[in-house]
Amino acid sequence: MNQFKKDFYKKISFEKDIIHNKNILSNKIYNQNILVIGGAGTIGSSYIKQILKYKPSKITVVDINENGLTELTRDLRSSNLLDYNPEYITYPVNLLSDTFDKIFNSELWQVVSNFSAHKHVRSEKDKISVEALIKNNVFGAIKLLNLCELNPPKYFFSVSTDKAANPVNIMGASKSLMEKLILSKKNKFRVSTARFANVAFSNGSLLDGFIYRLNKKQPLSCPSDIKRFFVTPEQSGQICLLATFLGETGNIFFPKLDFDKDQIYFKEIALDFLKENGFEPELVLSEQEAKKFDFGKCPTKYPIYFFQTDTSGEKNI
């Protein structure tokens, strides 16, 4: 499984920008007080790992996922990233709560980075879900920007998505509005954001789901007509790091990717995934057929169902 990830990541690797800007990043991050909201997720935790390399004096991580914060702490302590003994604090708190206000107003922050977001199109499946999405992506941003306006940080960053460009769904539209709200503050304090595509094997992603399905001996399914740009979890943190500290206020950062060469079909990844794990893909015609597959009779084969997308909420690239 890990080897498959390594081989997959080789296809989408980039490191030059971090190396080229190493001294600039060090000068801007060293000995700073940093607040990260939504830091227990895939992108937020990767960002924290990147930023700790430049030795801030203090880093405070806020996330509603208490288990995620626990795992982040274990991960950081098991590495050498906290060996220089920075002040490191975590709070299992919602950005929209009064408790968060107390945390924010308790001290001055040089860097405020926000990764708290609803990121999936499926988050708009009903009215309640849409309400939660808008509260998080839009009203959460408004609240955070208003707090920052009272006590401006040196750097404010909030992650966006490629779906914010010409949005075709509510999630993308909410992030597009979030971007506009952020840019409206560009003359009051330094603000930036970053758009990028799918983070490969991130929590809750389709590729991450492949691993769960395989471990549970459940069929795989994925769209046959959708291809995407991918970045690795590490690269997602690097992009956000660069966007936070480089460029001008009001900039929207995104990776330079080749439209023709760098997109990958989910179908191709699924087939490679099964082959790398020692299985021969067994193509089935329906979800029902996939569920009836007898793993005992065919131990070297694995059922996979490909379907054509039929929702206007998803872009085809």
Where do the language-model regions lie?
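Hydrophobic/aromatic anchor residues within beta-strands of the central parallel beta-sheet
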Residues: T90, L133, F156, V191-A194
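NAD(P)H-binding glycine-rich loop region in Rossmannoid oxidoreductase-like domains
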Residues: Q50-V61, R77, Y84, V93-I134
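N-terminal Rossmann NAD(P)H-binding glycine-rich loop of SDR-like oxidoreductase domains
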Residues: I34-Y54
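Mid/C-terminal beta-alpha module of Rossmann-like enzyme folds, strongest
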Residues: L246-I317
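Non-catalytic terminal and boundary segments that flank Rossmann-like NAD(P)-dependent oxidoreductase
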Residues: M1-N33
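A conserved pocket-lining segment of Rossmann-fold NAD(P)-dependent short-chain dehydrogenase/reductase
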Residues: G209-V231, Q235, I239, A243-F266, ...
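Conserved Rossmann-fold NAD(P)-dependent oxidoreductase catalytic core, especially the SDR/UDP-sugar
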Residues: N114, H118-S123, K127-K135, F139-S176, ...
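Helix N-cap at the beta1-alpha1 junction of Rossmann-like dinucleotide-binding domains, i.e.
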Residues: D63-G68
